[in-house]
């Protein structure tokens, strides 16, 4: 049992150091001196009885304990800000511009309707919604919040899981009547595969797991596109086998217009909100992330706890 609890201001100092990359830059952000920042980190490390940061000529790096502390600090500070927002006598409302990015298919089918509902709840917000067919850089593309269907998030961003998702192999019954259904990943090379080049997907390489191992298989076919919506239409027309997100194909699987191929295999493709600044700093960012998380989980359902994609 600790003799005292870490102070919120010390957790904030740690977060600022991680995001700015140095003690001096964190001090400037906080409006304090480097000596103040150093002292608060020393107090935090003494309180927790562990080393949180390693300093060298190349910069500052989190220790294993520091990484865990940083992750908890983000959550604690966000909860603390939520407490202040909820109980303060002067109710504040999120306002101003927020720029949101997403891929075309998921953006049109899910995020655009979500933004419509978001604006009903928070009319003081201004939203610029931009769709991309490539992986974006939040700074260069001037995006505050990016919705990504991809588990590989760079360390210099913060990511909040909106909901679980996986990509699965599907084909129309018409196609599977013409060609024997593959019994292994290797047999995919003998099939017409509908290849998609969207944002995070490597063209012609499908990485699939069965809960025990992950394999990469090279695929090809007569048709390919950078539009998942076009590839889905081709699959429905019986043109080949595709790899698509579960949220995109579930209605067609239920209606029998598509059949799952090699159902023991899938590709992890969870849906994330990706941003640069901690949520406790920005009410409008926090409101958007929390709203989109609730929206996605309500409409896409809870994840299948019994399935694990390697």
UniProtKB/Swiss-Prot annotation:
Segments crossing the lipid bilayer: none
PROSITE patterns with a match to the protein in the record: HTH_LYSR
DNA-binding residues (ranges): 23-42
HTH lysR-type domain: residues covered: 6-63
Superkingdom, natural source: Bacteria
UniProt keyword list: Activator, DNA-binding, Transcription, Transcription regulation
A Pfam family it matches: LysR_substrate
Keyword DNA-binding: yes
GO biological process: DNA-templated transcription; positive regulation of DNA-templated transcription
Hydrolase among keywords: no
GO molecular function: DNA-binding transcription activator activity; DNA-binding transcription factor activity; sequence-specific DNA binding
Disulphide-bridged cysteine pairs: none
Function in brief: Positive regulator required for L-tartrate-dependent anaerobic growth on glycerol. Induces expression of the ttdA-ttdB-ygjE operon.
PANTHER family reported in the protein's UniProt record: HTH-TYPE TRANSCRIPTIONAL ACTIVATOR TTDR-RELATED, HTH-TYPE TRANSCRIPTIONAL REGULATOR
Family as reported in the entry's similarity comment: Belongs to the LysR transcriptional regulatory family.
Official protein name in the record: HTH-type transcriptional activator TtdR
Gene source species: Escherichia coli (strain K12)
Name of the coding gene: ttdR
């Amino acid at each position: 049992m600790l003799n005292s609890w870490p102070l919120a201001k010390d957790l904030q100092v740690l977060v600022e150091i991680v995001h700015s990359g140095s003690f001096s830059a964190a001090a400037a952000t906080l409006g304090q001196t480097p000596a103040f920042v150093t002292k608060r980190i020393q107090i935090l490390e003494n309180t927790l009885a562990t080393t949180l940061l390693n300093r060298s000529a190349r910069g500052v790096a989190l220790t294993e304990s520091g990484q865990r502390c940083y992750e908890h600090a983000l959550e604690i500070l966000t909860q603390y800000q939520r407490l202040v927002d909820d109980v303060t006598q002067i109710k504040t409302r999120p306002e101003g511009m927020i720029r949101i990015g997403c891929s075309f298919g998921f953006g049109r089918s899910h995020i655009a309707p979500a933004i419509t509902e978001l604006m009903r709840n928070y009319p003081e917000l201004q939203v610029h919604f931009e769709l991309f067919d490539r992986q974006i850089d939040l700074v260069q593309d001037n995006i505050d919040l990016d919705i990504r269907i991809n588990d590989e998030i760079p360390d210099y961003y913060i990511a909040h899981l909106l909901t679980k998702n996986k990509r699965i192999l599907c084909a129309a019954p018409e196609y599977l009547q013409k060609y024997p259904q593959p019994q292994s990943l290797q047999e995919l090379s003998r099939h017409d595969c509908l290849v998609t080049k969207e944002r995070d997907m490597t063209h012609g390489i499908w990485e699939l797991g069965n809960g025990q191992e992950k394999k990469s298989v090279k695929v090809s076919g007569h048709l390919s596109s950078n539009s998942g919506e076009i590839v889905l239409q081709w699959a429905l027309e019986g043109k080949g086998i595709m790899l698509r997100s579960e949220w995109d194909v579930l209605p067609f699987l239920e209606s029998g217009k598509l059949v799952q191929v090699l159902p023991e295999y899938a590709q992890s493709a969870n849906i994330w909100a990706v941003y640069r600044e901690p949520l406790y700093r920005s009410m409008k960012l926090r409101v958007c992330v929390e709203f989109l998380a609730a929206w996605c989980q309500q409409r896409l359902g809870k994840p299948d706890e019994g399935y694990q994609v390697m």
